[in-house]
């Protein structure tokens, strides 16, 4: 089972990627996160872990599995017969970026979990996408204005 949401932002891919990897800031960007606490120090890297607390969900320990600077941040968590992968992708789109968030569930109980939690997963993905888009747009330099007609 997979959920995918996409939006465009005026910020560069590098600006969006910085938001992706600043996981402890995520609760400032979206109400779908109560807290994110890194379990290691230093720059985020493959193998880094964090405890994520979200409304209506049990706390989950997420481990970074893939980093492509200025492009992709992927992490996963497992429990209760389900492995969940969260993929955060940013691509150039004209002067700005295309942001894609995907959530994939697999494992013996993923179908049942999808039925029980699919609505929450879709809502939270949309909230998180809007949080990243809004924060990226706020950080983007203003678009150049057109010269006066004359």
Located regions from the model:
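Intrinsic-disorder/low-complexity, polar/charged segments enriched in Ser/Thr/Lys/Arg/Asp/Glu/Gln
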Residues: 1-6, 49, 59, 72, ...
């Amino acid at each position: 089972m997979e959920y995918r949401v996409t939006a465009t932002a005026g910020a560069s891919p590098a600006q969006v990627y910085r938001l992706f990897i600043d996981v402890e800031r995520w609760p400032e960007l979206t109400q779908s996160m109560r807290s994110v606490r890194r379990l290691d120090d230093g720059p985020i890297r493959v193998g880094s872990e964090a405890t994520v607390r979200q409304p209506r969900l049990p706390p989950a320990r997420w481990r970074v599995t893939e980093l492509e600077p200025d492009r992709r941040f992927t992490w996963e968590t497992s429990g209760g017969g389900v492995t969940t992968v969260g993929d955060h992708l940013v691509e150039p789109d004209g002067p700005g970026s295309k942001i894609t968030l995907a959530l994939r569930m697999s494992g013996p109980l993923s179908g049942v979990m999808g039925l029980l939690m699919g609505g929450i997963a879709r809502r939270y993905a949309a909230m998180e996408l809007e949080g990243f888009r809004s924060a990226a747009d706020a950080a983007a330099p203003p678009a150049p204005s057109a010269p006066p007609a004359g």
